Amino acid sequence: MQEIRTEHLTVGYDKTPLIGDVNLSVRPGEILTLIGPNGSGKSTILKTITKQLKKLDGTVFLGEASMDELKDSQISRRLSMVMTERLRTELMSGREVVASGRYPYTGRFGILSKEDWAKVDEAIALVHAGEVQDQDFMKISDGQRQRLMLARAICQDTKILILDEPTSYLDMGFKMDILTNIRMLA
């Protein structure tokens, strides 16, 4: 079972606690939503769970293992994420950005197989981003970038998908479509 859970997690910045004693558990097929006002620490919790921020206290488990005991390569095969921060993607097409989600499955040289490219194309189709896949990622709209970042996480093909404001920058039609796809993926 690929459950993700936290026990007595304390998150914050520069050794200053923001939120303490966070106890979450999400099992396969479940969707958990963190709700709160801007600046309340939702993104900080997600960044800490995904090891983008150092935890101040407590434990994050991926399955039965503490994430402290797992290598980054092990984590990236089991957990994917879409965060609100911008990737540095100089001179990359949308399709190349999505393809980077397959890197945990490639060898040392990062060469994708036909099967990898099929997963990339399937994820792009799922988020309806085919029209921008060949364009420079930095020259498309925020909403188009958001859809491609979701495709990147989907084609990473993990059991756990962590999304920080996944419908940011999207118009209403795409918001509904993305939320439907997220439900289907669960």
Protein language model regions, located:
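Conserved structural motif at the start of ABC-family nucleotide-binding domains
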Residues: I4, I19-D21
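The feature captures the beta-strand-to-loop junction immediately N-terminal to the Walker
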Residues: I35-P37
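Helix-to-loop junction immediately C-terminal to a conserved catalytic motif
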Residues: T50
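Conserved ABC transporter NBD signature motif
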Residues: G58-S66, I75
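Conserved ABC ATPase "signature" region
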Residues: A99, K114-V132, D157
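Conserved ABC ATPase signature
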Residues: G110-I111, D136-I140, Q144
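Catalytic Walker B motif of ABC-type/P-loop ATPase nucleotide-binding domains
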Residues: L161-E165
